[in-house]
Regions:
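Active-site helix of classical SDR
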Residues: 106, 144, 152
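Residue(s) in the substrate-gating loop at a strand-loop-helix junction
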Residues: 126
Length: 174
């Protein structure tokens, strides 16, 4: 989903910034875009670290001047773990990436969009926000994506009058 989105945005003329927990993967994705004559940059980013989000945001602003569109696509799923057997670390890891990471990015990039007079944020949720994909026992994933959808609605309501649109997409289970 992430690379296809980056590719579509770059084909529409956007300068694309690719972030990934795996710095090499971000560079490889950027090189694929550059091979098609597109421009952009790649950055290592752990979305679970709010200070890292702030540092990367600062680097992007210094390099590109502004951010008009943010797509929050980082996410993980750990399936087939019954809720009654799920350890705390699994629950927290999924919520940290899927929900906290989205919030840290929305807060940081959203603030600069508010200051510059507008922007658009797209959060990648899931159909699992609204239905349970049983037999995939993944209470933590479903809860995290439902929270992303509600966070999106909350931010959309808060920021709409200040010209920052916040929406979510809900892809099928991949």
């Amino acid at each position: 989903i992430g690379f296809a989105t980056a590719e579509a945005l770059s084909e529409a003329g956007a300068t694309v910034v690719i972030t990934d927990m795996d710095a090499h993967a971000a560079e490889v994705a950027l090189e694929k875009l550059r091979a098609k004559g597109r421009s952009g940059s790649a950055h290592h980013l752990d979305v679970t670290d709010p200070r890292a989000v702030e540092r990367v945001h600062s680097d992007i602003i210094n390099q590109h001047g502004r951010v008009d569109v943010l797509v929050n696509n980082a996410g993980i799923a750990i399936s087939f773990v019954p809720a009654e057997k799920m350890d705390d670390a699994t629950w927290l890891k999924v919520l940290d990436v899927n929900l906290n990471g989205v919030f840290w990015c929305c807060r940081t990039f959203g603030q600069s969009m508010l200051e510059q007079g507008g922007g658009a944020i797209v959060n990648v949720g899931s159909m699992s926000a609204d239905i349970v994909n049983y037999p995939q026992e993944q209470a933590q994933y479903n809860a995290s994506k439902a929270a992303v959808h509600h966070l999106t609605r909350s931010l959309a309501a808060e920021w709409a009058e200040r010209n920052v649109r916040v929406n979510a997409v809900a892809p099928t289970y991949i």
